[in-house]
Amino acid sequence: MYCPNCGNPKIQRADNNKPVADFQCNNCDQIFELKSKNGSLGAKIVDGAYSTMIERITSASNPDLFLLQYSENYDITDLTLIPKFFFVPDIIEKRKQLALTAKRAGWVGCNILLCGIPEQCKISVIIKQLIQNRQDVISSYNRIKKLKIDSIDNRGWLLDVLNCVESIDKREFCLKDVYEFTEKLQKKHIHNKNVEAKIRQQLQFIRDKGFIEFLGKGRYRKLF
């Protein structure tokens, strides 16, 4: 597998002293975690310890995530990449701690809520056994890298508003369409006193990064 970040022809298995990574690019030092599942990915995928995951995504050591799907015959069917800068605590679901009778009693795992990550933040590398053009994958990675935000709070707002825009079932939409999600966003961001202003701020950011186009008079067009 090549590196989708820099185009290096082959990424290597990560050293044993990198517990959060399965693969690493020796050219750009990008690290990758691999999760595999038989059949459809569904809305969530099991990951490791909850506390470790939260610590990872709020630090600089979080890897990009490869999601591999395979058939009952162990043939690879799909491969999807989610860059590390689209992970926020809200998409990490805490699982029940293991029972006292379990080998790792009290251990708390987590699930990654894939349904909380906008489709624009997912890059298809293989679709139904069809390998996507390498340069297209690299270009897609470089394009969505424009949405990278270091602040976890602002990153969460970006994903929330981008999810709202994606769920609007038309290519051209207006500001009022996004305001329909105000109540939902207010419940999620209870300390924010001006959700509509935050929506406008995120729409401007998404527009500036080339994912939507402003048509004037509160109207927008999706560019994805």
Residue locations for each model-derived region?
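Charged low-complexity interaction tracts in eukaryotic proteins
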Residues: 197-224
